[in-house]
Amino acid sequence: MRSRKKLNKRKIFIAAVFTAIIIITVICIDIKIKNKIEQISIYYCNISVSEIINKSVSKTLNDNNTEYSDLVYELYDADNKLSSVKVKTDKLNILQTQIISDINRQLLNNSKNKIKIPLGTVSGSYLFSGRGPEIEIKFLPSGSVSSALNSELTSAGINQSCHKISMNITADITAVFPSGSCNTSVQLNCILDRKSTRLNSSH
């Protein structure tokens, strides 16, 4: 009788240990898969959002037929030599507003789309890559896009300078997938225009 009770207790203990191992294994696999989904989501989010930002910048510049002279005052000295450059803040601000508005609109439209990743790809196994049921991922804007204008004059050789006007654009995005979500911030520096100029050597 005692030996039977001991045997039952041993079976219960083994079953409990086996169950605990299975639960821990499942939890570890779930965490690993979720982390992999987050990595993949952030990767594709950066590609998708960067493409939207670049297209919005190009579209806005083209729609306005923007040229360097539209954004900058070139100041000349008495000898008609270029002495300095000054950005047209008002026009740049208008351009900046148009670009951000278009980016926000495109991000909102893009949130209706989904990318699909095979579960085998998420597993990280080469054998199962591209196989299995698909996981759907959506990218949702989690706030308004922010930006900062930059005007930079750098040396490009003897008495030669390169003036560059750019925008640092930041978009906060939430990637949503079946097992949860993750947040990421996509940052991109977009050149609005640039020009190499020869400055007066006396300045």
Language-model features: where?
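Hydrophobic membrane-insertion alpha-helices, especially the h-region
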Residues: 13-30
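N-terminal Lys/Arg-rich, disordered targeting/topogenic segments
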Residues: 1-6
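Short, solvent-exposed beta-strand/turn "edge" segments of beta-rich domains on protein surfaces
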Residues: 92-96, 154-162
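Structured, soluble extracytoplasmic/luminal domains of envelope-associated proteins
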Residues: 85-139
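Short extracytoplasmic
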Residues: 42, 46-79
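Beta-strand elements of well-folded, non-transmembrane domains
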Residues: 107-111, 165, 169-177, 190-194
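Aromatic-capped interface at the extracytoplasmic side
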Residues: 29-39
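Conserved small/polar residues in nucleotide/adenosyl-binding loops
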Residues: 197-203
